Amino acid sequence: MKTYLFRSHMKNTQRILLLIGCFWALLGSAQKDTNHHLWVNVIDAFTGQALSLDRNVKVDLLQLDSTVVSSAICRERRDQGSGERQMIVTFSVPLQKDPRFLLRASAAGYATKYVPVTLFWNKRFAESSKDISLRRTTASDAAYQLGEAKVTATKIKFYNKGDTLVYNADAFQLQEGSMLDGLISQLPGAELKPDGQIFVNGKKVESLLLNGRNFFKNDNTVLLDNLPAYMVHRVEVYNQESETSKLLGHKVDEGQLVMDIKLKRQYSIGWIGNTEWGYGTEKRYLGRLFALRFTPQSRLSVYGNLNNVNDRRKPDGNGGWGDFDPSGGLTATKRGGFDYSVYDKRNRFRLEGDVNASYTNNDNQWGGTSTDFLSSGDVFNAVSSRQQTSSLNLSTNHNWKYTNQTTNNGASFSPWFSYSHNDYHSNFRNGTFGVKPLDNYAEVLDSLFSPEWTTTVRHLIRRNGQQARGNSDGRDVGASYWTFIKIPQSRDGFSIDGHVQYVHSKSGEFNHFTYNHLEQEAMQTDFRNRYNYFHQQNTTVKARLKYFWHWTRNIYLNPSYTLQFKRSEGNHSLYRLEFLPESEGKDLGWLPSQMESLLQALDTDNSNESTLNNWSHQLTLDWQWNKYVKDENFRTLSSWNVTVRPDFVYETNRFDYRSANDPQHLTPGYWLPQFYFQLKRGTPSLRHRLDFDLSLITSAPSVTSLLRRTDTADPLHITVGNPDLKRKLDGNVSFNYRADQWLQRKERQLYGSAGWHITHNALAASYTYNRQTGVTTTQTVNVDGNWNAWMNLNFTLPLDRKHRLMFTTASSVNFYHTVDYASSREQEHPVRTTTRATLTSETLRLNYRYKSVNLGLTGAATYNHQASTLEGYASPNTWNVRYGLHAVVDLPWHLQLSSDLTMFTRRGYETASMNRDDLVWNARLSKSLWRNQLTLMVDAWDILGNLSNVNAGMNSRSMWEYYTNVIPRYAMFRLVYRLNRQPKKK
């Protein structure tokens, strides 16, 4: 039967490939172009930048005897991928007997230059590009200094230039002393997360650049926290071309969405630096140092900061505080590092990298209540936790790249290394009840864990607590590589890329675990003195060969083959130290001095070693059709982009699981086909941008979940393996819309998205809850019926002619349909339950700016409704509302006052104390001295003392309402000093 299915599958695959091949052939035969298309870009030999338009740049195509074949005046255009300005001329040359020609380039103030060029022709399509560098004939020519367009006539906030969204930084009024994060938080359509992630128009920014180049590539927070906002000229958002696309001269992939921070001219060369120091009440402190040196071909930056004010959680100038950070707590951070970049003006080579070090202390306390939904009746938990952690992190990343401008070949090598060490100790308490306690969680736990606690607590299911201390170490070392070779006299090429990685980690934890439950009308006690040791090392080797076939002018075929090998070796040893008589009365962290004694305490049922060898073969057929309509200046007027990419993946595993009781050997293999389709449309005059995406992705279950074993290492949460797990299939459909030129001149912004995701054979946890003991037994199973849908719409527009009053609305609706299995002990099999959840949110902003006054109103509301097929399910409805106002006002004598007042409202929660209103007020007064080189500030944080971190939410299985500790209100005096030193003009 399996053989028949395999043959049937192969026949269907062959038919599909045959149809695709015929389709390509038909398209190819219909679009033959025998002319050679030559693109010429004229640049300055010294700066490496395109010449200015007023230079009257001209290029002649000559035969070897100097006979003029064609002549043209260069036109200015912006590269759609990198945003770079170019002076371009194009020639369409029919087939010639002699393929050798001369290019003659001339421009006012520059020496004429002759460059030989050899053209080629083929049956499908021939195209090539050439850069010509001209040298100036005068030593100085200030009249022709290159410059960039400035938005000075009006303080327009944003506009589109081709495929680039440009924000004018000077149009935003910020608090004195604001860093880059304060600016980005105010950009229309941009969203800044607490961890430094940036989203623009709903899409994640993959890289944050400084003047077009990487800056601490793996950590956005360095630039966000240390670059002063006053240095920024523009913020540009665009899809950056990949290195392969640049070398081929045409788009072969989507590249990556980047946010490029363009500095003002006076800060783009020389030394700049700033330092800030502050001290306040409640022993709050802050210190920061940042220095940056620019030259035309290099950059060096150094930073360092220390603080205990949780500076990732702060007002954003729009009445908001960013998203809730579940790590929370009180954090003291010390971090520093440096970044370097060296490159030549012709982009032949680039050396860049960074080194980072950080040391963090965190005190995280949280507590509250939660409700677990069960078919036989809900259970209620009162819980509290405190964990103190210290972490040391070191990392370094480097990139070395070389490009041959003559052959358009390139290569890069990127090594990395990171090290981390963590120490922690924690205390956890929990009480589980069959009926919701009347007292608040703190009173319940204090009574439950007091020395005089009584075993006759009403409705108690279990009492459990744990004290723990431990540490962990981790190292990650590896390197990625990339090589591209362009086929001579063609638009084709191939690349070889991949990476090698080794990850090593180990950890050890001591914990004292106490568990009490009622059984046969007697309170049972389970005490465990445990030592957990983990050791893991992973090795990955990956290589890919990809060919880029320029089929016709508009059609590309990019097949690739990827081979990947992963080896994982692990060791988990659990020691039950309470089995040793000498452990009685010992403090947490005790180990016997002899290894023989330690081995006697080994829990053989929950200790194991394992080795996994995984091989993955992937064949990808990437077909693209791109159609652009351009004007005489090479600006895109409309576009079509279609991508069809089927992937054929075969994965094999060899898993050796070694334990004292049940060693196992597994060799699962999977076919994991994938399919991706994308359609992108730029309507005429680029008035609208439309994107449609469809994907089907098959994935295999984790090999460890296929083991036939029962893990009882945690006596309250038992897990059971499932050898019968199947592959899952994820289907995604999404549509994105963005208004482009349609609303650009009116300074309006409109974008939206809608999508649907469904999973076949989704992996879900089927669990059984024992109401007598409070023990949960979980097994991973396949389920059908999981899907979710969403829709988002965002709109920004001015409400007056002079664009002083701006209005922004952001709406979203998310619907979740979730299926899983749950039961209590009274039922034989877990019951299939279906949960439907609707999450709706709306944010409104109104901002007024006139001269030195910036006022704003903000309102946001989130509504969450949930229903379930569980018997007796309460169908909760919760509201989270935020509204307030903020202001930034410039006063006489170089003073500035900024303040925000926000009301946080919560409704619909089970705990009465959660349904509350918190009014939060912050203010800052600053004064600038010495021509703005020195700034004095006084901050007042949470003046009314109402700020609270509340983590409240729900899913298909539970609802929770937790409080975390927050920074107490404080006042701080801060001093900021700025330094800008430019090289002397010769």
Regions found by a protein language model. Give the residues of each.
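Primarily recognizes Gram-negative and organellar outer-membrane beta-barrels
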Residues: 37, 218-221, 241-283, 298-986
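A short, amphipathic beta-strand motif
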Residues: 36-48, 132
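Short, acidic, small-residue-rich periplasmic hinge/interaction motif at the N-terminus
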Residues: 62, 106-108, 128-170, 193-195, ...
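A short, solvent-exposed loop/turn motif at the edges and junctions
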Residues: 66-68, 87-90, 94-119
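Short acidic/polar hinge/loop motifs at secondary-structure boundaries
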Residues: 213-241, 296
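Short, ordered, surface-exposed loop/turn motifs in non-cytosolic proteins
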Residues: 47-72, 160
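Extracytoplasmic beta-strand/coil segments of soluble accessory domains associated
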Residues: 181-216, 244-253
